Amino acid sequence: MGDAAIKGVIITSAKKDFAGGMDLNIIARMKTDAGDDPARGLFDGIMGMHRILRKIERAGTDPKTLKGGKPVAAALPGTALGIGLEIPLACHRIFAADNPRAKIGLPEIMVGIFPGAGGTTRLVRKLGPMMAAPFLLEGKTDSPAKMKAAGIVDEVVAPDQLLARACEWVLNATEADIVKPFDQ
């Protein structure tokens, strides 16, 4: 982020989908790798994810002046579930391809867990608690168009325009576009 030649970042996938969620065996591995203190292993692993996503969210912004950051956009070509939505929620703008088979959401509750990488907090901050509740407590997933209507996705674009539109936004984003309201 310190390189002046880099104007911003677009996080995307070359595959038809962005991410269908995290392999839950990773959570089990965090616990077993910790030996005698599985709770500490799980805590440290989850906090590591939080630190990474917070770096995306801050994107080099000086915490005192709120200046100097770089815009980060998520460009979702298809399905984005679980961590596949938590990563975009840490970005400054979420673009999704108008893909009728794509599903977007946080279905973790369906297996008895909450989004662990900050998605719970970021979704509530983006939508407010009442609007976020069905997505968090029911594991509701839906199409890109319906997620735009709900306020989760910022723009739905033609699949062949996804990267071009995200790039256009990154190159024209202002500092006001990249400072989250809760950081002000």
Where is each model-derived feature located?
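A structural preference for short, pocket-lining loop segments at secondary-structure junctions
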Residues: 1-40, 51-75, 97-102
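Terminal peptide-recognition signature
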Residues: 11, 23, 88, 123, ...
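Glycine-rich phosphate-binding loop at the start of an alpha helix
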Residues: 21, 43-46, 50, 82, ...
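CoA-thioester-processing core
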Residues: 60-63, 67, 81-135, 150, ...
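Conserved AMP-binding
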Residues: 78
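Amphipathic alpha-helical segments at domain termini/boundaries
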Residues: 86-90, 131-184
